[in-house]
Amino acid sequence: MNLLQTHLDGIRKTFPDLVSAATESAGGVLTIAQSREGSPSATQDGQWIHSAYDPRKEAQSWAALQTKEWHAGELGVVLGVGLLYHVEALVASKPVGARLAVVIADIAAFKDALAVRPLGPWFNAIEWIWGSSDEMATQLASKSAPLRFFTYAPA
């Protein structure tokens, strides 16, 4: 069984609608390339979305900067998934009492990430947001917590 199918099977019980959306998506919007340190990285339309050298280290440095102003009780919101390095790093460094939501603007990119990145328990610590722009805005508005937005610029 391939990594994508393993992930979809593993998250189906908790996130059945997300699995359906990913299954219906064609994927293939990210071009996967091996980074110099060996883990997968990716480009989209010729632009690196994570470091071509060490995507984990880059994500950890970025997350450390983001968490300086993130407080307990806030819902951190990440716009975009990339290969999820930045999401994983935020989960690892989020303040006690803070929550994290990830807005999946492009379900095809999410599917590509599931096909190449191993998931850990951190995946279930995230509130996943997807759908139309109106649906995503409604989902975020219903969270009843102060929102702190994080954006992850391409490498």
Where are these regions (language model features)?
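N-terminal donor/sugar-recognition subdomains of glycan-related enzymes
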Residues: M1-A155
